[in-house]
Structures are given as C-alpha cells and as structure tokens.
C-alpha cells in the first residue's frame, strides 16, 4: 500500500467534530464549500532537499575559496615552488635535493587541481567567466598531462608555467594588482602605439635597403637585417657602432650626411616619441584608476555617514498592539492548492536577463528615434514658409472665434446664462483642437 493511501486512511479515522465552529464561521462568511485536505507531499517539491544541500555546499565552498587562510596557503606553496625552481638551476643542488623538490612540485600540483575542482563545484559555468580561472585551468591541465605525455614533461614548459601561476598570487596584493590591471587595460592603446612604430620601421627599412644596401650590406642587406638594425636604433644602444660603418676608407660625405639624417629622424620618431608614448599611455590609465578609486572611496564615506545619520534620526514609531491587530486580517486561510512553480534554473534566469536587456535596448532605441522625430518636426516647423502658413491659419481661426463671440445668434438672448457660456466654451475648445491638429500635421 502506498504512502498516499495510508495518509488518507489516517485522515478518515480522525475525529473532526472540533471543526464544527470553524465550519459555521465559513458558512457565516458565505463559503459553503467544504475544506479541501491536501497531502503536504503533493505540495512539496522533491528536488528542494537536494537544492538546499547543493546551495549549502556551494556557500561553504565559496567561503573556503575566498578565505584568507586558504589564499595565504596557496601563495606560500607557489612561492616555495618558485624558490625550488630557482634552486634547481644549480645542477649540484638539483641532484642533491631532487626528491624534496619533486615532492614539493607534486604537492603544489595537487593543491592546484583541488582548487580547480572546488571552483567547478562552486559553479561550473561561473568558473569560465573569469579570465584568471581559464589561465589557471590551462596551466594545471598542461602540468597534469605531463604525466602522460613525455613531450609536455619538459623543463622548458613546466617551469615557466609554474612561475606564471604567481601572477594570480600578485593580484591578492592591492598595489601589485593595481599595476597589473593598469597594464592589462593599457594593452589596446599599447598595441596601437606598437603598430605605429612598426609602420615607421617598415618605411625606414625600405628606405635603408634602397639607399644604403649596396654600400653597407652588413646592416641593410635585406628587410630582415634592416629591421634588426632599426630595432637596435630604437633601443638607443649600439646605433653609434652602426653609424661608424658608414665612414669608409674613401670619405664620402654624401653617405655620412645621409646616414646621419636617416638615423637622426628615425631615432627621434621611434625612440623619443614612440617609447614615450608607451609611458604616457600607462601613466594616464594609472591616473584614471586612481581617480576612480578616490571617487569610490568618497562615495563609500558619504554612504556610511548618511546611514549613521539615518540610524540616529529615523526611528520607527511605536504602534499599539490593538492598532496592529486591526490591520491584520482574521479571515481563515485556505490551504495551498496545486503544485508549486518549477524551480528556477540558471538557463531560465539567463534567458530572463537577456529579455530584460533586450527590452531596455529597445526602450533606448525608441527614445533615440522619438528625439530624432521631435528634432525633425522642430526643423520643419522652423522653416519660414511653414511659419507663415501657421500664422495665417492661427489668425484665421482666431478671427472666426472672435466674430462668433462678438456676434451672438438671435436666439441667444432667449437662452440662459449657463447655456450661453457652455456653448462658447465648446466653440473655443473646438478651435484649439483644430489648431493643435494643424500643428502636428506640419
């Protein structure tokens, strides 16, 4: 016998005589239908227990990942691993303490794998929305695959990846994190500056190969050699040795003067202007970030001050219990009928957010179109010809209304004062409506 049938048998055996006064109250309120008894298991969702457990686990996992002790432990292990990698560069220490260094590497890799798995438990799709998580997963995946693929288990691959993981640790320190964020935010502008410098290098390399390729083949034999020579000139280290090769045994002043002008122009554009642009881009972004941080700090201070003032001034008034009872309804409540709504999933929440965003974008576009239409109407109405027509029509309607009001009909003397005023008001309203319609039509 199912649990549902057992429940109904228990309900039938219960004495419900004590419900008589309640039924009479229902009848007095005009509710002649009988009270419906519902099994609570039909109302409750079976997935709720699992959802509660999943929510609790995610909450504890999130607290663990964000806990300062866990972050400090991870930073300590990564720093120790970086130190062991630096010590392994010495062949004597690497052979003597090989087992210790390999054990530290395995422990650090295990902790990194556990961190990735905990991030997946916290939210699989949320994990991939952070760029640092993607970088950590790529590093851990390559290091883990090194146990199975020998080509990946190389010192040239594993050591740089382990040291690269320290970048995420630097994000925990606020000054270092600020500098890293500034560099990452400056990457598009820095890419534009690099493209500009590369363009100048290509142009000057073509000039150098064309003008000096036959005389100084050591530095301007082809495009590759010329680009390398110009890169040395940008660094401002070694360009003087390149220029000394222009001074041949047989003095040719044209070559020396041409080379001097060539290097002077390129070093001025590439080294002084180009490299200083890098510094300008980074410093401007750093200043903007500092200003935004100061503004946010001032806003937080203002919010805290206002909250403190509200706590001191705005106190809830005291209410007597009798007044509170008057507001609460004493009508007997019906039990919940029907099943609950389906649990909200992440997919439906994302779809709902997308719909809200689309509605907001449509409203913004509607406002822009409405503003453009209003501007067009204003421009059309500001034309002199349209203004003259509008004035003529207004004068025509105002003159008609004035003549109508000044010359009342013969039967008006026989009417009451109220009827005459109502008729005149209707005439004036009709004239105003006609004028407004004419304005909107133009």
From Swiss-Prot:
GO terms for molecular function: calcium-activated cation channel activity; voltage-gated calcium channel activity. Gene3D superfamilies: 1.10.287.70, Voltage-gated potassium channels. Chain C. Residues 223-234 dip into the membrane without crossing it. Residues 1-66, 126-129, 176-188, 284-442 are cytoplasmic. It comes from the Eukaryota. Residues 89-98, 154-156, 213-222, 235-255 are extracellular. Pore-forming subunit of the CatSper complex, a sperm-specific voltage-gated calcium channel that plays a central role in sperm cell hyperactivation. Controls calcium entry to mediate the hyperactivated motility, a step needed for sperm motility which is essential late in the preparation of sperm for fertilization. The chain crosses the membrane at residues 67-88, 99-125, 130-153, 157-175, 189-212, 256-283. In contrast to the human ortholog, not activated by progesterone. Activated by intracellular alkalinization. This is Cation channel sperm-associated protein 4. It is a multi-pass membrane protein. Testis-specific. Disruption phenotype: Mice are normal but males are sterile. Male sterility is due to defects in sperm motility unability to fertilize intact eggs. One of its GO terms (biological process) is sodium ion transport. Component of the CatSper complex or CatSpermasome composed of the core pore-forming members CATSPER1, CATSPER2, CATSPER3 and CATSPER4 as well as auxiliary members CATSPERB, CATSPERG2, CATSPERD, CATSPERE, CATSPERZ, C2CD6/CATSPERT, SLCO6C1, TMEM249, TMEM262 and EFCAB9. HSPA1 may be an additional auxiliary complex member. The core complex members CATSPER1, CATSPER2, CATSPER3 and CATSPER4 form a heterotetrameric channel. Belongs to the cation channel sperm-associated (TC 1.A.1.19) family. SUPFAM superfamilies: Voltage-gated potassium channels. It is found in: Cell projection, Cilium, Flagellum membrane. Keywords: Calcium, Calcium channel, Calcium transport, Cell membrane, Cell projection, Cilium, Developmental protein, Differentiation, Flagellum, Ion channel, Ion transport, Membrane, Spermatogenesis, Transmembrane, Transmembrane helix, Transport, Voltage-gated channel. InterPro entries: CatSper4, Ion_trans_dom, Volt_channel_dom_sf.
């Amino acid at each position: 016998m199912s649990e549902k049938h057992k429940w109904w048998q228990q309900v039938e055996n219960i004495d419900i005589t004590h419900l008589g006064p309640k039924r009479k109250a229902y009848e007095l309120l005009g509710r002649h239908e009988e009270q419906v008894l519902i099994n609570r298991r039909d109302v409750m969702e079976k997935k709720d227990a699992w959802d509660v457990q999943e929510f609790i686990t995610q909450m504890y996992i999130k607290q663990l990942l964000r806990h300062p002790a866990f972050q400090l432990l991870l930073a300590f292990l990564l720093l120790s691993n970086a130190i062991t990698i630096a010590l392994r560069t010495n062949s004597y220490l690497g052979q003597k303490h090989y087992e210790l260094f390999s054990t530290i590497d395995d422990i650090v890799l295990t902790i990194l794998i556990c961190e990735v798995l905990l991030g997946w438990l916290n939210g699989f799709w949320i994990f991939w929305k952070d760029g640092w998580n993607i970088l950590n997963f790529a590093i851990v995946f390559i290091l883990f695959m090194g146990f199975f693929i020998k080509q990946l288990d190389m010192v040239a691959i594993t050591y740089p990846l382990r040291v690269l993981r320290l970048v995420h640790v630097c994000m925990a320190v606020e000054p270092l994190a600020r500098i890293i964020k500034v560099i990452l935010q400056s990457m598009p502008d820095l890419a534009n500056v690099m493209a500009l410098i590369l363009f100048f290098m290509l142009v000057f390399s073509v000039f150098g190969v064309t003008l000096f390729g036959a005389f100084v083949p050591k530095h301007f034999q082809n495009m590759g050699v010329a680009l390398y020579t110009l890169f040395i000139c940008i660094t401002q280290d070694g360009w003087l040795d390149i220029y000394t090769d222009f001074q041949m045994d047989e003095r040719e002043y044209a070559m020396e003067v041409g080379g001097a002008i060539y290097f002077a122009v390129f070093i001025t554009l590439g080294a002084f202007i180009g490299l200083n642009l890098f510094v300008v881009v980074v410093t401007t972004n750093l200043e903007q970030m500092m200003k935004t941080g100061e503004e946010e700090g001032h806003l937080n201070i203002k919010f805290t001050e206002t909250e403190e003032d509200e706590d001191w001034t705005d106190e809830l008034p005291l209410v007597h219990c009798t007044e509170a009872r008057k507001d609460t309804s004493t009508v007997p409540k019906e039990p919940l009928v029907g099943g609950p709504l389906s649990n909200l999933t992440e997919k439906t929440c994302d779809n709902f957010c997308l719909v809200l965003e689309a509605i907001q974008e449509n409203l913004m576009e509607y406002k822009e179109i409405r503003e453009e239409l209003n501007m067009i109407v204003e421009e059309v109405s500001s034309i002199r010809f349209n203004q003259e027509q509008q004035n003529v029509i207004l004068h025509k309607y105002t003159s008609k209304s004035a003549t109508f009001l000044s010359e009342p009909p013969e039967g008006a003397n026989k009417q009451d004062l109220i009827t005459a005023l109502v008729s005149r008001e209707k005439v004036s309203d009709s004239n105003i409506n006609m004028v407004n319609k004419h304005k909107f039509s133009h």
